[in-house]
Amino acid sequence: MRADPTSTVLIVGASRGIGFETVKLALKAGHSVRALARSATAIRSRDPKLEKLDGDALDQHTMERALVGVDAVIQTLGVSPTPELIFSGTRLFSIATRILVNAMEVSTVRRLISVTGPIEE
């Protein structure tokens, strides 16, 4: 991936797992990164091209604010598998994606990569 030195990528679900690995790879590729997580202080990086943003991916207003000034979105939401969640499933991925796409429709952002977890909905 060749980075445009002025490109900014929003990574949703950036505090750990695939999300945090994606943050590291995007920074290494030269992108500026806006990392959204419920607890952005958990993101362990001090890279000057990293902007940490606390927020809830299920909140429309949060997603609209997070999209301002970004060129692309990588959605990497995950859940901690609990016995209840494994047997009942989750709608986190479908709901968050719907909210994100709605927010993108009123923004200028048109690029989206979404990585979801193994829990069936």
Predicted stretch roles:
Residues R2, S7-A29:
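N-terminal Rossmann NAD(P)H-binding glycine-rich loop of SDR-like oxidoreductase domains
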Residues D4-P5, A29, P48, V68-G69, ...:
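Residue-level preference for short coil/turn positions at secondary-structure junctions
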Residues T6-T8, L27-R34, R38-R46:
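N-terminal beta1-alpha1-beta2 submodule of the flavodoxin-like/Rossmannoid cofactor-binding fold
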Residues T8, D71-A72, R111:
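Structural motif
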Residues I11, A35, K52:
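Conserved SAM-binding loop
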Residues G13-G19, G30, G55, G69, ...:
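Glycine-centered flexibility sites
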Residues S15, S32-R34, A40, I95-E121:
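Conserved Rossmann-fold NAD(P)-dependent oxidoreductase catalytic core, especially the SDR/UDP-sugar
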Residues T41-I95, I99, A103:
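NAD(P)H-binding glycine-rich loop region in Rossmannoid oxidoreductase-like domains
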